[in-house]
Amino acid sequence: MIYLDNAATTLRKPPQVEQAVLDAMRTAGNPGRGAHEPTLHASRLVYAARCAMAKLLHAPDPSCIAFAANATEALNIALGGLFALGDHIITTVCEHNSVLRPLYRLREQGLQFSFAGVDERGRLQYDDWDKLVQPNTKALVVTGASNVTGNGTDLAKAAVFAHRHGLLLIVDAAQTAGSQPIDVQALGIDVLCFTGHKALLGPQGTGLSLIHISEPTRH
């Protein structure tokens, strides 16, 4: 079989990943919940994973890393926890349901959002974004690349726009983490969410949030 669906999930994991899963099932206890060796071993594994992810993403500190079950959970937590009644968010028509469904749910609770559009080839129209900014706009939420068209977002342009307007920059990197380099400090990304089972070749049930809000934002 020729497998061409790696953007959905990588089917055949490297032997090292398979072995790591087996080792975790056989030797790892509950991290942070005891002082016996299996628990300490699990805590060391978790910290090592945080350090590895921080290095990969050029995060300032491993403490910026929080694990989740997948990108959907990570995005739900971020979107549900950062905004208040009456806040406004700018997002795009390219987003995955892991962004869209939480936003529609939050709209029922008073959140407002606007969509940035695309041209006839599905490419984002960056020059139109300034028209979407409102006095209560708090964040720009963008995908690194569309899961439908494969078109990528110019994160450098997105970052310049967000910083110019004092907005948080939240990036769904499910389609790009592991396949494209990401430097959260150079770009000024405040929140980055992704899954481990795609280009990172990890197992199902792995996800991550990187949270590093360094610039003052609108109040």
Which residues make up each language-model segment?
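Pyridoxal 5′-phosphate
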Residues: 1-214
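Short "domain-exit" segments at the C-terminal end of structured domains
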Residues: 215-219
